[in-house]
Amino acid sequence: MSTADPRHVPVLGPEAVAMLAPREGGTYIDATFGAGGYTRLILQSPGTRVIGIDRDSTAIAGGAALVAEAGARLTLVENRFSAIADICASLGLSQVDGIVMDVGVSSMQLDSAARGFSFRFDGPLDMRMGETGPTAADVVAQAAERDLADIIYIFGEERHSRAVARAIVAARKEQPITTTRQLADIVARVVRSKPGDIHPATRTFQGLRILVNEELDELEQALSAAEQVLAPGGRLAVVSFHSLEDRIVKTFLAERSKTGGGSRHLPEIAQETPTFQLLNRKPVVADQSEIEANPRARSAKLRGAERTAAPARLPPASSSWPRLADVLRGG
């Protein structure tokens, strides 16, 4: 899907937008614009304004018709969603009333052979959500075997990561690995699967994609930025698609919705006021009809929270995840 499609209904879209509870005059951020599905649903509420963000220039260009239709109610920004606070500042917005995030790779990216995200098509081994920076082919060509194994294990949750890394290093000595089909075939030779299992290369592709786009760093930064710009009573709705993403969202909201433990020596100083109130303790998941219509919905989880009036907490000083630049320079 190359344009914002009026027929496109995002995974858990109605549930996520209902969680936002858009109101007339409110300003909302669709932090992962994609095909424009969440934005269209928000704009159905009269008098709402949407800021749509996407790092993919194809998504932004594809939203031109929706911008023409919505007029001043819709502004599209090509950027990473971790830059929410800076984007708001550049638009003169001190606060917004709601933020929706649909984390990870989009369907239109997965379905494009030229983008190199999927082993279902033979294409260049790219995997970048934007147009700049190293590709997955660069990682496969340059990363040390140990680093490849760590990436595939940590980000892909692949228990055969060391065997996969060895196979990649052996194969790249014979010829450059530049296509999705090449990589998928290499992985399939060392990761065995039974009928009904996921494709043997699924987890390896996930691990490389997450590293190339630094997706988990981005998510952590975006959640912290959302905390900074949401008005009291503003709502955050996040749809995630695998356990690493969901764990980050769940942990962030759990930490921000509880009172700090305090200290018997300095109880007043140590105590932190909750910055969010949970809207759901258990994640919302897709029903069977949605899963049948869109199999990708099977793993989707929706979590939400409402911003309190407490001051935002300081963002994390540094990331604990492997960094792309470090991997490419060998540590």
UniProtKB/Swiss-Prot annotation:
InterPro entries: RsmH, SAM-dep_MeTrfase_MraW_recog, SAM-dependent_MTases_sf. One of its GO terms (molecular function) is rRNA (cytosine-N4-)-methyltransferase activity. Its EC number is 2.1.1.199. S-adenosyl-L-methionine binds at G36, G37, Y38, D54, F81, D102, Q109. Residues 287-331 are annotated as: Disordered. It comes from the Bacteria. It is an enzyme of class 2 (transferase). It catalyses: cytidine(1402) in 16S rRNA + S-adenosyl-L-methionine = N(4)-methylcytidine(1402) in 16S rRNA + S-adenosyl-L-homocysteine + H(+). Pfam families: Methyltransf_5. One of its GO terms (cellular component) is cytoplasm. Its main location: cytoplasm. One of its GO terms (biological process) is rRNA base methylation. Residues 309-325 have a biased composition (Low complexity). It is found in: Cytoplasm. Keywords: Cytoplasm, Methyltransferase, rRNA processing, S-adenosyl-L-methionine, Transferase. HAMAP family: 16SrRNA_methyltr_H. Specifically methylates the N4 position of cytidine in position 1402 (C1402) of 16S rRNA. This is Ribosomal RNA small subunit methyltransferase H. The lineage of its organism: Bacteria, Pseudomonadati, Pseudomonadota, Alphaproteobacteria, Hyphomicrobiales. The gene is rsmH.
